[in-house]
């Protein structure tokens, strides 16, 4: 078993329990522009993907142009709710401390949003290395973001473990040649078809309590010692 030298965390739904807030804000904004979409549809189509992808889909599938006004309204509404409602995933701080392995964040969100999420939830000091899809050409499910993070952290892809909650993120990690663990402990994990889609992608492990990650990493170390 290859040694784990870097753990790459997705942000939304893995570090912070943000997906229900984000999806609610996005659906309302899309509905107001005349896009007839539900929260379940947004989860199924856009979980783990960038806002740029959402905007492209609105244009191609619904012939709706989302301009600066849409983006600014989304930002104001979302950030306001994050400051009031956002919570960390239970046990994430203790888990990061216990891992004793370099960690970083690689998210489809903008850097500003990632930093706000981590600041509000008290995690910013534990995760200073932040990488956003805005830093690469192609977002998830392309491998670009994870490869960029590994390169910046000076770790080979084969020595990285990615912790993801989205199908797009799992696909991206696999395409990058990294091992991937699927976390299903976020509040959004009960939407229809979610678990089935994750299982279809065959992540190396699926877990729903964050401290379990410590044992998964330790198990890899033991497996490496006893082939």
Describe the role of every protein-language-model region.
Residues 1-44, 61:
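Active-site neighborhood of HAD-like aspartate-dependent phosphohydrolases
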Residues 80-105, 111, 115:
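Short, acidic loop-to-helix structural element flanking the phosphoryl-transfer center
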């Amino acid at each position: 078993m290859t040694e784990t030298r870097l753990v790459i965390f997705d942000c939304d739904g893995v570090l912070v329990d943000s997906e229900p807030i984000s999806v609610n804000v996005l659906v309302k904004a899309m509905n107001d522009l005349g896009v007839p979409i539900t929260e379940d549809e947004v989860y199924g189509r856009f979980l783990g993907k960038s806002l740029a992808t959402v905007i492209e889909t609105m244009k191609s599938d619904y012939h709706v142009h989302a301009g600066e006004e849409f983006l600014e309204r989304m930002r104001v509404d979302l950030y306001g709710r994050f400051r009031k409602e956002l919570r960390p995933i239970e046990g994430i701080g203790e888990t990061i401390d216990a891992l004793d392995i370099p960690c970083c964040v690689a998210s489809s969100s903008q850097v500003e949003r990632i930093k706000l999420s981590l600041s509000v939830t008290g995690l910013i000091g534990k995760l200073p290395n932040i990488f956003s899809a805005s830093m690469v050409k192609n977002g998830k499910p392309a491998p670009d973001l994870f490869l960029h993070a590994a390169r910046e952290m000076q770790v080979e892809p084969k020595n990285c473990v990615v912790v993801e909650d989205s199908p797009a993120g799992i696909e991206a990690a696999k395409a990058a040649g990294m091992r991937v663990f699927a976390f299903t402990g976020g509040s959004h994990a009960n939407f229809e078809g979610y678990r089935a889609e994750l299982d279809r992608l065959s992540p190396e492990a699926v877990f729903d309590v964050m401290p379990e990650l410590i044992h998964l990493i330790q198990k890899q170390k033991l497996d490496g010692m006893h082939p």
